[in-house]
Amino acid sequence: MIVFYLSGDRVFSTDQNAINGLYNKRHFGKLVEGKLFLSLLEATYLVERGKIEVREGKRKLTVEELMNLGRERDELFDAKYLVYKDLRDRGYTVKSGLKFGSHFRVYRRGMDEHSQWLVWVLPENSRLSPNDITARVRVAHGVRKNMIMAIVDEDADVTYYKVEWVRF
């Protein structure tokens, strides 16, 4: 079992098996100075699947404890996790979309050089202004990506909507 250690709002490992298997082959995390860092979303997903364990000191953390840590830091953590999990389970590579004003960048199966989609996660009861939608679609269009809205309902089902410019 590959061991990761909690460090703030992410986890890390220096295990070469983690770096080779999770980063190089399956495109999880970010490699910084010989350490593989995973977000809490990635760590929760991998712990839930029995691929890694996360420790805080010597204590092993459960999936629920990781979920609670995520919830403390992000009120949308549950919705984001459902979308992250759904996309990963479908075989897509999912990375942070922060620098593009979205929650995720999503790559086709495998890992192309450029992501195909930007995904914005919203609970179904969210209120959206036309300006919010326009701004996000404009950014996606400007970086040649498709904008996807992932709506999570109260039954934890995810529905995806592609939002794009239409020219007449």
From Swiss-Prot:
Active site location: Y107, H114, K145
Origin: domain of life: Archaea
Catalytic activity: pretRNA = a 3'-half-tRNA molecule with a 5'-OH end + a 5'-half-tRNA molecule with a 2',3'-cyclic phosphate end + an intron with a 2',3'-cyclic phosphate and a 5'-hydroxyl terminus
Alphabetical keyword list: Lyase, tRNA processing
Annotated GO biological process: tRNA splicing, via endonucleolytic cleavage and ligation
Family membership: Belongs to the tRNA-intron endonuclease family. Archaeal short subfamily.
Primary role: Endonuclease that removes tRNA introns. Cleaves pre-tRNA at the 5'- and 3'-splice sites to release the intron. The products are an intron and two tRNA half-molecules bearing 2',3' cyclic phosphate and 5'-OH termini. Recognizes a pseudosymmetric substrate in which 2 bulged loops of 3 bases are separated by a stem of 4 bp.
Enzyme class: lyase
Entry GO terms, CC: cytoplasm
Protein name: tRNA-splicing endonuclease
